[in-house]
Swiss-Prot record:
Pfam families registered for this protein in UniProt: Nif11
UniProt organism field: Prochlorococcus marinus (strain MIT 9313)
Function: Lanthionine-containing peptide (lantipeptide) with unknown function. Does not show antibiotic activity against Lactococcus lactis 117 and Bacillus subtilis 6633 bacteria. Organisms that produce this peptide live in oligotrophic environments at very dilute concentrations, suggesting this peptide is not secreted to influence other bacteria.
Cystines in this chain: none
GO cellular component terms, A-Z: extracellular region
Covalent cross-link Lanthionine (Ser-Cys) as placed by the record, residue numbers: 76-79
Crosslink feature (Beta-methyllanthionine (Thr-Cys)) location: 78-82, 81-90
Propeptide residues, chain positions: 1-68
Record's protein name: Lantipeptide prochlorosin 1.7
2,3-didehydrobutyrine sites (modified residues): 69, 73
Amino acid sequence: MSEEQLKAFIAKVQADTSLQEQLKVEGADVVAIAKASGFAITTEDLKAHQANSQKNLSDAELEGVAGGTIGGTIVSITCETCDLLVGKMC
């Protein structure tokens, strides 16, 4: 798994509004967009990241989600092909 590549891609998406817009398009292919941006990630990387992210939520993050409010910006990447959501609160 290329966790470093995925983390680097997420960081780039957070800083690049053009990438954010590309990923918001319905049916956007996250892996293809990442590849076009110079990152080598796979669907398996996205699945593993999602599984790990769900396991590692803090109590504050869980409370924020349950309450419907989060005091930060959430950058999310949705893979329409595999129906995954990769997100990070900043």
